[in-house]
Amino acid sequence: MKHKFLFIIYLLIPFEVFSLEDENFSFNILVYNTHGLPEIFIDDNPKKRFPIIGEKTRDFNISLLQEDYSHHEELSSGLGTESIAYRGGMGTFLCPLCTGSGLTSIFNLPDGWLIDVENETYEDCSGWLRGANDCFAYKGFQIIKITTPNEKEFYIINTHMDAGRRDSDRHAREKQLEHIVSAIKKKEDI
């Protein structure tokens, strides 16, 4: 069985989506980097900003958020009562200074739709104490399987990849893309 994949990276605008075989489904999707670092590193009032981001997600069927590191409770306070949020991996105790993936996927879909979210952490990163410091986050991706009420399935990928402009950053992103492709191929073989 061939699966349908919708691969989205770093889009800041909503858009309408595709058809599956003979049935048309139209979604409003938001992909947004929330800039959710701890307050000590930013000065844009995340305690005020994150509930507003949560409220904005109510206008979309699917919201794929990145950098939801430190203000998830504030974000959740703005969600609709029917909203379903899946937060990415939270890291491990081996690095107490490291944060989780920062990924959050929020769904406002009609009744009868099934959502299954798998979180994967990248094996490669670039930057501990210089550059973008991406190794302090357990960055990765979410493979989201959505099943319609009539059992049509499709997948969406939410990811937050390595930042930076150095060769080591580009190499890490290349490895991260390979990781995503490998995970997709495993799904296609099922």
Provide a role label for each language-model segment:
Residues 37-40, 128-129, 164-167:
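A short acidic, helix-capping loop that chelates divalent metal ions and anchors anionic groups
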Residues 4-14:
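Sec-dependent N-terminal signal peptides
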Residues 62-155, 159-161:
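Structured beta-strand-rich core segments of catalytic domains in phosphoester-bond hydrolases
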Residues 14, 18, 182-185:
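N-terminal non-cleavable signal-anchor helices
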Residues 59-60, 109, 187-190:
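Structured helix-beta-strand junction loops
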Residues 140-159, 169-190:
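His/acidic metal-ligating clusters that form di-metal
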Residues 2, 17-79, 91-100, 152-154, ...:
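N-terminal, active-site-proximal structural segment of metallo-dependent hydrolase catalytic domains
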